[in-house]
Structure formats: structure tokens, C-alpha cells
């Protein structure tokens, strides 16, 4: 009956509102909580503050360090240098944990190595922004070694870089590796 449905809906909304209030009142406890808060706020200053709090809890948190660089390093060269430093530290973390051996070729499928891949991909992107195409190509190739399925779509940017550098041999090898139509569109540019 209609009264029962109304009563049920009223009870649902009361419980839902109570849960929402409890969640708002609960203080962040983990670095991930602070990372979430940093993503949600619109103020750059507040976001940076939350990222610093995340790093107080987990100084080696790659996602927090990456986001801090993206929010504070304004110029591409400044970002590149900061990312290079972070990548060096991240490489040491991965080496120490044995991730390079354990997850070889499958870095994106392992939850533990995704922050590393985000750092590496961002570095790749910044190299392109800085016009450092040869270094970007090396980085793109490294990303494909770490994640053979290319879950990040690196092959598309890499194909553009090969075309830009007129590197037909590597472009054809990349096309053969992924054997898909999308990359063939760029192959014609190499012959121009």
C-alpha cells in the first residue's frame, strides 16, 4: 500500500542522511583519505595542504608526490626535473620490492605498481611537452616493456613520435606488435 511505501522511503532517506553526516564528520585517517580530499577541493592551496598531510603519513606515496608536483610545478621544465627526481626514487622503490621481476610486462595489472606507472606516464607526457622527442620515445618504449598490453595507450603517442622523427622501422615494428588499424593511419605520414 502507498502508506507503507512512503514510510519505507522516509526511513531510507533518514538513514541515508545520517550516514552522509557521519562520513562528513569522520576525520581522514590514511594517506589515501587525504589524496581523495585533495582531488575533491577546488582550492589549490587546500589541495596542496592535503597532499602534504598525505605525505606526512606516507612519505613514499608516489601518487601524493606526483599530485604535489602537478599542483606546484608550473613550468614544463620544472615539472620534468621534479618528475625525473621522483622517477629515480620510484625506480629504487620498485627495485627494492622486486616489482620489476615479479610484474615484468604486467605493471598496469598489478595494483601495487599503478602509482609507478602513473609517474612514468606523466614523465613521458612532460618530455613531449618539453620537445624532448628522443627521450620521450625511449620513455614510451620503456612503458611498453613494463606493460605489454599497453593499458595506458602509449602506442598511439609513440606512433606519432615515430612519424615525427621519420622512424619508419620502429613505426612498422610498433604496428606489427599491436596489429591494429588505428596505427596504420600514422604510417602514411612517414612517407610524406
Feature roles, as predicted:
Residues 34, 65, 120, 155, ...:
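TPR repeat positional signature
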Residues 190-192:
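Conserved small/polar residues in nucleotide/adenosyl-binding loops
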Residues 75-78, 114-118, 163-173:
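Alpha-helical linker/edge segments of TPR/alpha-solenoid repeat scaffolds
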Residues 59, 148-149, 182-183:
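Short coil turns that delineate tetratricopeptide repeat
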Residues 120-156:
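Internal, conserved structured core segments that host functional sites
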Residues 1-114, 129-131, 137-145:
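N-terminal alpha-helical interaction modules that lie
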Amino acid at each position: 500500500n502507498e502508506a507503507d511505501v512512503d514510510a519505507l522511503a522516509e526511513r531510507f532517506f533518514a538513514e541515508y542522511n545520517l550516514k552522509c553526516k557521519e562520513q562528513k564528520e569522520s576525520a581522514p585517517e590514511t594517506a589515501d583519505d587525504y589524496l581523495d580530499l585533495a582531488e575533491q577541493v577546488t582550492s589549490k592551496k587546500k589541495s596542496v595542504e592535503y597532499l602534504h598531510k598525505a605525505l606526512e603519513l606516507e612519505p613514499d606515496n608516489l601518487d601524493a608526490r606526483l599530485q604535489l608536483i602537478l599542483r606546484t610545478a608550473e613550468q614544463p621544465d620544472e615539472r620534468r626535473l621534479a618528475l625525473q627526481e621522483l622517477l629515480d626514487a620510484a625506480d629504487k622503490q620498485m627495485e627494492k620490492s622486486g616489482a620489476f621481476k615479479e610484474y615484468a610486462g604486467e605493471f598496469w595489472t598489478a595494483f601495487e605498481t599503478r602509482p609507478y606507472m602513473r609517474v612514468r606516464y606523466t614523465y613521458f607526457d612532460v618530455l613531449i611537452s618539453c620537445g624532448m622527442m628522443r627521450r620521450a620515445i625511449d620513455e614510451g618504449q620503456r612503458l611498453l616493456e613494463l606493460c605489454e598490453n599497453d593499458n595506458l595507450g602509449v602506442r598511439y603517442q609513440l606512433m606519432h613520435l615515430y612519424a615525427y622523427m621519420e622512424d619508419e622501422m620502429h613505426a612498422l615494428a610498433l604496428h606489427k606488435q599491436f596489429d591494429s588499424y588505428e596505427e596504420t593511419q600514422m604510417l602514411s605520414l612517414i612517407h610524406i
